[in-house]
Amino acid sequence: MLVVKKTPYIKGILSAPPSKSYTHRAVICASLANGLSNLKNPLNGADCLSSAHACEMFGAEIGLGNEKWIVMGSELKTPDNIVDIGNSGTTLRILTGISSQISNGYTVLTGDDSIRKRPMQPLLDALKQLGLICFSTKNNGTAPIVVKSGKISSNVVEIRGDMSSQFITSLMMTLPFSEDDSEIILTTPLKSEPYLNITIDVLDKFGVKIGKIEEKNKSGYKIKGNQTYKPCDYTIEGDYSSASYLVAAGVLLNSDIVIKNVFKDSKQGDREIIEIVKKMGADVEINDDNVKITGPYELNGIEIDVTDIPDLVPTIAVLGCFAKGKTVVYNGEHVRLKECDRLAACTAELSKMGARIEEKKDGLIITGVHKLNGAKLKTYHDHRLVMAFTIAGMLADGETIIEGEDSVKISFPDFVDKMKSIGSNIKVI
C-alpha cells in the first residue's frame, strides 16, 4: 500500500519514463527484423518486458539492459510453450495477429486474471476475415487465445474504429506479411488515432510503410504486401501519459519543477495534457524537450473530448476536483475497456475523498470542490489510477491510503522514488 499525506511544496528536475507504447512496438518490430537492432532508452516496465519475453518465445534473442535492449531478430518460430503475457493487453493483441505468421503449428496466448477478461472478439473476427484460424478457448472472445499458422487469403478487412486501437495496430503489423496489398476499412469513426500514428511511425523506422485511406465514403489504412521488417537503431522518447501525473502535481501544488524527456513535436496523443492545463489556466512552459512548471495555478473547468486521449482521464478527473466550476469529460466510452472501467473507478474512489463526480455513459462531470479528504482507495490493479490518486492524496487533508501500488511497475517503475525526489510526502508500507 501507498500512504500519501498533504505535500506543501515540490521542487526538482526529473525525467519522464520512456514511452510504453513506443517500447512495445519497437521491440516487436525489432524481433521481426532479420538482424541486429539497438533500442535505446526502453521502458523496463512489466508490460514491455512481457513483450520482450514473448518475442523471445517466437525466436528473437534479446539482451535486456537498463538503458539499451539489443535485439537479434529472426524468422518467426513456433513457441514451445504457452505464451503468458502477464497483464499486457498490448502484447496480447499485437501478438495474436503476428502469431498467425509462424511457419507451422499453433500459438496459445494467455495472461493474468485481468487480461483473461479483456475483449478480443473484434480482433479475432478481423483475422478470420483474412482467412486465418483463431479462437477463444472459452468461446467468449477472451484469452486464452489459440491461433493457427496460416496464409493471409483476403486483402480487405473491416473493423470498428471505436473499440480499441490495439486491434488495428495488430492488423497493421501483421498485414505486411501478406503476399498481396491489403486494406483495413473502418466501419465506425476512429478513436485513439494517436496510438495508430505511433504504430505507423515505428513501423516506418523499421522499413514498413502504412498509408491512409481518406475518401468520401471510405476511411482506413492501406498496406503493401511482401514488406520486410528491417533492423535499425532506435531511441524511445519519454511518455506523456506518465508525465501527466507530474504535470498535474506541478500545476496544483506549490511547485518549481522541470520535466525532461518530453518532446514538443511528439506524435503521442497524450501530449494534449499540456494544452488541457493551459486551457484550464496554467501558464506552463513547453520547450523542445522539457516542460517547466511553477505552480500553483487557479484552474477553471473546461469540456474535454477524450476520444484520442483515454489514458488521461484519471489525471483529468483529479484536475477537475480542484478547478472552478465544472469539468466535463465526454466521448469516453472506450475508457471503460482499459485495465478496469476507469469512469466508474474514478467516480467511486474520488467520491470517497469528497469529490463531486457524476458518471455518464461516455464520460464524467466533475464539479470542483477545491478540497479533498484523505481516504482508503482501491485501484483495481490499474497503474494509472494509482498515480492519479497519489496526486489527489498530495492535496488532500489527512492521510490517503492507496491499495495496489505495485501496479505502477507496468508503466512507471520508479514513480514513488521520483515523486519522493521532488518532495512528495509518500511512502510504501
From Swiss-Prot:
Single GO MF descriptor: 3-phosphoshikimate 1-carboxyvinyltransferase activity
Pathway listed: Metabolic intermediate biosynthesis; chorismate biosynthesis
Signal peptide limits: none
Active-site residues per Swiss-Prot or TrEMBL entry: D311
Keyword field: Amino-acid biosynthesis, Aromatic amino acid biosynthesis, Cytoplasm, Transferase
CC per GO annotation: cytoplasm
Matching PROSITE patterns: EPSP_SYNTHASE_1, EPSP_SYNTHASE_2
Localization of this protein: Cytoplasm
EC number: 2.5.1.19
Main location: cytoplasm
Disulfide bridges in this chain: none
Keyword DNA repair (UniProt): no
Binding site for 3-phosphoshikimate: K20, S21, R25, S164, S165, Q166, S192, D311, K338
Stretches assigned to coiled coil: none
InterPro entries: Enolpyruvate_Tfrase_dom, Enolpyruvate_Tfrase_sf, EPSP_synthase, EPSP_synthase_CS, RNA3'P_cycl/enolpyr_Trfase_a/b
Function: Catalyzes the transfer of the enolpyruvyl moiety of phosphoenolpyruvate (PEP) to the 5-hydroxyl of shikimate-3-phosphate (S3P) to produce enolpyruvyl shikimate-3-phosphate and inorganic phosphate.
PANTHER family recorded: AROM/DEHYDROQUINATE SYNTHASE, PENTAFUNCTIONAL AROM POLYPEPTIDE
Subunit: Monomer.
Name listed for the protein in its UniProt record: 3-phosphoshikimate 1-carboxyvinyltransferase
Organism placement in taxonomy: Archaea, Methanobacteriati, Methanobacteriota, Methanomada group, Methanococci
